[in-house]
């Protein structure tokens, strides 16, 4: 069921609407789909390839392979959305887009955890006029998930 839901998300992102650009050309739509696919019953380490840059996807898959090989935690021992091991997102997530160039920018996600305001940032990239993809998760405290995963 989870795979079917994830495939539906990818299909909706990539399917062009009549006379409109595909939803994947809206960075906030991609960020929301990534968040929804990697929380709840989703899996951060197995996002749909369409939602993440090749480099970030490779890093996430590497962490999954390490966890399976080691039969436990490898590099990531916390929930990047919570910037901690425990807690819950208490408010609806608000998204905002900050463009840096035609092929790079950042989606800011605002929400509350433990009654504190959190801002998680998703650097976004795209090739030419293609689809936007998540390239990293910058936690509320500023930790880069991609840099953490690059550590030996």
Where in this protein do the model-derived segments appear?
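Bacterial N-terminal signal peptides that target proteins for export
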Residues: 1-7
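Bacterial N-terminal signal peptides
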Residues: 7-15
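Short, low-complexity N-terminal intrinsically disordered segments enriched in polar/charged residues
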Residues: 18-41
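Surface-exposed, charged secondary-structure patches
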Residues: 22, 60-116
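Short, well-ordered alpha-helical segments enriched in acidic and aromatic residues
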Residues: 42-71
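Low-complexity, intrinsically disordered terminal/linker segments enriched in charged
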Residues: 69-72, 101-104, 108, 114-119, ...
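Catalytic toxin/effector domains delivered as secreted proteins or via bacterial secretion systems
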Residues: 122
């Amino acid at each position: 069921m989870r795979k079917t839901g994830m495939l539906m998300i990818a299909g909706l992102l990539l399917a062009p609407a009549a006379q409109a650009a595909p939803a994947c050309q809206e960075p906030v739509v991609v960020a929301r789909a990534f968040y929804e696919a990697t929380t709840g019953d989703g899996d951060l380490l197995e996002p749909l390839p369409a939602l993440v840059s090749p480099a970030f996807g490779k890093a996430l898959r590497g962490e999954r392979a390490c966890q399976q090989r080691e039969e436990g935690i490898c590099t990531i021992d916390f929930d990047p959305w919570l910037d901690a091991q425990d807690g819950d997102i208490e408010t609806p997530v608000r998204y905002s887009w900050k463009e840096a160039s035609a092929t790079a920018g950042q989606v800011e996600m605002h929400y509350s955890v433990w009654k504190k305001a959190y801002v998680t940032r998703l650097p976004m990239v795209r090739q030419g006029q293609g689809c936007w993809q998540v390239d990293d998760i910058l936690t509320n405290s500023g930790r880069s998930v991609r840099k953490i995963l690059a550590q030996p």
